[in-house]
Amino acid sequence: MRALFPGRFQPFHKGHLAVVKWSLERVDELVIVVGSAQESHTLQNPMTAGERVLAIRRALEDEGIDLRKVYIIPVPDILMNSAWVAHVRTYVPPFEAVVTRNPLVKVLFEEAGYEVLEPPPFGREKYVATNIRALMALGDPKWEEMVPRAVAEIIKELGIIRRMRELSKRD
Amino acid sequence: MRALFPGRFQPFHKGHLAVVKWSLERVDELVIVVGSAQESHTLQNPMTAGERVLAIRRALEDEGIDLRKVYIIPVPDILMNSAWVAHVRTYVPPFEAVVTRNPLVKVLFEEAGYEVLEPPPFGREKYVATNIRALMALGDPKWEEMVPRAVAEIIKELGIIRRMRELSKRD
Amino acid sequence: MRALFPGRFQPFHKGHLAVVKWSLERVDELVIVVGSAQESHTLQNPMTAGERVLAIRRALEDEGIDLRKVYIIPVPDILMNSAWVAHVRTYVPPFEAVVTRNPLVKVLFEEAGYEVLEPPPFGREKYVATNIRALMALGDPKWEEMVPRAVAEIIKELGIIRRMRELSKRD
Amino acid sequence: MRALFPGRFQPFHKGHLAVVKWSLERVDELVIVVGSAQESHTLQNPMTAGERVLAIRRALEDEGIDLRKVYIIPVPDILMNSAWVAHVRTYVPPFEAVVTRNPLVKVLFEEAGYEVLEPPPFGREKYVATNIRALMALGDPKWEEMVPRAVAEIIKELGIIRRMRELSKRD
Amino acid sequence: MRALFPGRFQPFHKGHLAVVKWSLERVDELVIVVGSAQESHTLQNPMTAGERVLAIRRALEDEGIDLRKVYIIPVPDILMNSAWVAHVRTYVPPFEAVVTRNPLVKVLFEEAGYEVLEPPPFGREKYVATNIRALMALGDPKWEEMVPRAVAEIIKELGIIRRMRELSKRD
Amino acid sequence: MRALFPGRFQPFHKGHLAVVKWSLERVDELVIVVGSAQESHTLQNPMTAGERVLAIRRALEDEGIDLRKVYIIPVPDILMNSAWVAHVRTYVPPFEAVVTRNPLVKVLFEEAGYEVLEPPPFGREKYVATNIRALMALGDPKWEEMVPRAVAEIIKELGIIRRMRELSKRD
């Protein structure tokens, strides 16, 4: 069975990694959908889709996850919820299930007839992307403990922290 | 060095595969950009982006190419040539060069300051996507010899031939 | 005279029905424009355009309104207020007036030279779409009294209440 | 059962009317989808969506067809065939089948799991929209015999012939 | 009176310049609308909107035309003819007339209630943008005589000839 | 050197005028980019792009600024920050620098390799567009002192105050 795991991954944190591992114990192949691919350079969405693809890829390699079992595919938004499943389906190989806890994603895929796999709330209280981004914008290094080691490295290498600190300045 | 290899890959044929191998002798990582990602279900563009991603992936695996050196990323069209390079750049990891023989792609990436690597015209006379699609629509099995074995299999498995034969009927 | 009556109709309530009746006493034909047609599956816009068209149609039939005097036409948003009147005009038969109390709609149609018919604020304090949607999301059946009987039936038949309750869950 | 009947209806001719009648003998309700709604003012697509809605409505009334069994809904194009069914579905009430002879429409709805009803080729050799438009642009009144009487009247009333004759002039 | 003069100006030639002069004898201010602003880097549309703005500006200055009487404003396409006038109107100061010989432009502005000023066919047989572009792509310097001197200079300075020669190569 | 000065100019106020003058002491030509060109008829964005172009033009003329050194070019939004610089570049003549104090604009142009010229915060406490628009919507004439005289005149002439007062009414 092939399943989707959609998210914005701004950034890809340890909770996301736990979901990937949990999923790979249940499905043959996992398609990580990097959503809102067109967004970047804001405090809410600091990284480009390509930067997120790179960070996820490095994290998976660093964790020794078999890349032959994973696809990482950026998908831009479409401003029509009722066509979103069909839109995503265009960008990815055929799949049978979706891994998500998000209410909107669940409703849309259920109405489209897909199976929904709900992962446990891995470290939900600790790994919250909003908090991680707030620390990044403040330049507080505590964000580094919340993401896989390889993600922290690539984020620093790509200059994302400097970008976020600039973006958080006043006009 | 990381390089892009953009194409529509309708379908991914033996000439494309030769370019991938040629590129991987020259660069560290190759990003295969599956262009016109929004197109499908026409005789000119029969496969969805996700179907093309799957076909390319299977071909690379079948050829024993190291997946850690390759990214396969679908990118939709943007109706503005002068912003196309920046648009593509959003979807992919940072890169320094582009592998192409296409005049428009060359002009756009050169004007944007990228290095262009021009591969030899591998089997240009034999592997022409337009001809391959014509054979597919006719149901003539000669198309199978023009694509990597794994691509032929996945195309049949996905029902692309049946789709093309239906699409070529008269109203 | 033919007039437009634009709204989002999320959902079509008794105040809307009163406006339709008021209008049909003043004009020969009424075009009900179901706006923001691309929106659905959110707490703010739960129903698809087609579901809203169906609900309105059933309400009009149930009330014995002559369907030959009414058009129900979904229109998606255009992100340009100054071209919105021309955009709407494309989707509907020629018209001379617009029925509205909305300040933006009034300004845009007045600047375009159309007559504006301002209906009385029918049950404004009782029939507020925001409140109706809040009750629907809570599963509180009081919303049913605020919409025409046929609308309540079709909303339940289409599973809109279940959809809204799912959407209002936490991640 | 509710079924869709999609077309561009540039203009709605006697062959289209025959399909509507044929369909209403087989389904409870018919949704006439006026496609390419955004197109108008060209020789290929002379009428706006609203003008086409009006022409179809008048033809149905003139033929004594019960309007309670028919929906006429304009739908703009989406540049993604694989999401087109979901896009159309947003604009219309729930349906189970589609009435069409068009190969692309058939493939897309079949892949989406809908039943396809194929009507006979009513007067295919006589009622060809391309020919009708050519006569209209030439100002040759023979086009009038090819469309329902009410359509001919509304086309003349709306000034479509004059528009087409202007558009066919040389720069 | 203020009037529009819409065109693609690929490139701005001596016929266009004659229309500008003819117009400025009849109206107080002229708004030159550089249409299809999103197009560039093709043989049909080689120059970006900004390059065309620059070329027109230089030509007007070189001819001693008072810049206080002219606006040069790029406008992207909108894929909806019936909303095009409203779309253009958004980008430009209020105006009363349009200068054009193009049938579609005439029909659209006349239906919107604007006055149409039809200029004489200045050197129609000599100054044809299609022919000028063909000469440019061939590298034949005869194109230079067909455009104002300042336009020829800026085209060479911007590297447009080299771009067109590259674009006209075979894959 | 040619530089860009991007803004929304809702409306163009005395602080903006000071930046234009400051820039023209440092660069040869200034391109005033009227951003969010597609927005209008809201309290946040009351004026169309064309109305803003007209207001800026009148202000520059009234101040005796040489129009041969200035371009005023409307540019619509693109929903992709990482492609925004390339998008803007399409609409304007070639340039080397950008005049801005906006953090996002700085980050985007710096990442694209452009020089950023940061003007002093001219009358920052006095000339705040948000406050000016609030006064305009209230009908408080104090806004007139905050914009160049010619801008105040054209705003009144175009009926912008009346439009804003209408838009600020309750439904």
From Swiss-Prot, chains A, B, C, D, E, F:
* KW Nucleotide-binding (keyword) present: yes
The transmembrane residues are none
Q: Where in the cell is it found?
A: Cytoplasm
- Which GO molecular function entries does the Swiss-Prot or TrEMBL record give? ATP binding; nicotinamide-nucleotide adenylyltransferase activity
Q: What's any one GO cellular component for it?
A: cytoplasm
Q: In which pathway does it act?
A: Cofactor biosynthesis; NAD(+) biosynthesis; NAD(+) from nicotinamide D-ribonucleotide: step 1/1
Q: Which reactions fall under this protein's catalytic activity?
A: beta-nicotinamide D-ribonucleotide + ATP + H(+) = diphosphate + NAD(+)
Q: Which Pfam families match?
A: CTP_transf_like
Q: What class of enzyme is it?
A: transferase
For this UniProt record, give its keywords in alphabetical order, as a comma-separated list: ATP-binding, Cytoplasm, NAD, Nucleotide-binding, Nucleotidyltransferase, Pyridine nucleotide biosynthesis, Transferase
Where is it mostly found?
Answer: cytoplasm
Task: Tell me the InterPro entries matching this sequence.
Answer: Cyt_trans-like (IPR004821), NMN_Atrans_arc (IPR006418), Rossmann-like_a/b/a_fold (IPR014729)
EC number(s) stated in the UniProt entry for this protein: 2.7.7.1
Matching HAMAP family, A to Z?
NMN_adenylyltr
Q: Which family does it belong to?
A: Belongs to the archaeal NMN adenylyltransferase family.
In its UniProt entry, what is this protein called?
A: Nicotinamide-nucleotide adenylyltransferase
Give the source species. Ignicoccus hospitalis (strain KIN4/I / DSM 18386 / JCM 14125)
At the highest ranks, the source species' classification is: Archaea, Thermoproteota, Thermoprotei, Desulfurococcales, Desulfurococcaceae
